[in-house]
């Protein structure tokens, strides 16, 4: 999917429509001290004595696009609900 690098949209901090710069946000480094990681580690030690096979699953074929809109006037940034796309690139318009 192609998306413009600059978009005129509403800034919730200025309270008006301004030009926003769009930037792609990468996922931060996961902390091993999070509660969910400790829970997964505990769950790994519990078995079912070989009675059932594992449920098939894995990664989805597409990832959610994370983009940040930064206002050119007040320099504050905000996010929007994301969508799924296989390819995502920012283009000049």
From Swiss-Prot:
Function, as annotated, reads:
Binds to the 23S rRNA.
Cofactor remark: Binds 1 zinc ion per subunit.
Detail which positions bind Zn(2+).
11, 14, 71, 74
| Chain's gene name | rpl44e
Q: How does this protein assemble? A: Part of the 50S ribosomal subunit.
**One Pfam family this chain carries?**
Ribosomal_L44
InterPro entries per record: Ribosomal_eL44 (IPR000552), Ribosomal_LSU_eL42 (IPR053708), Ribosomal_zn-bd (IPR011332)
Protein's UniProt name:
Large ribosomal subunit protein eL42
Q: Which organism is it from?
A: Archaeoglobus fulgidus (strain ATCC 49558 / DSM 4304 / JCM 9628 / NBRC 100126 / VC-16)
Which GO cellular component terms are attached? ribonucleoprotein complex; ribosome
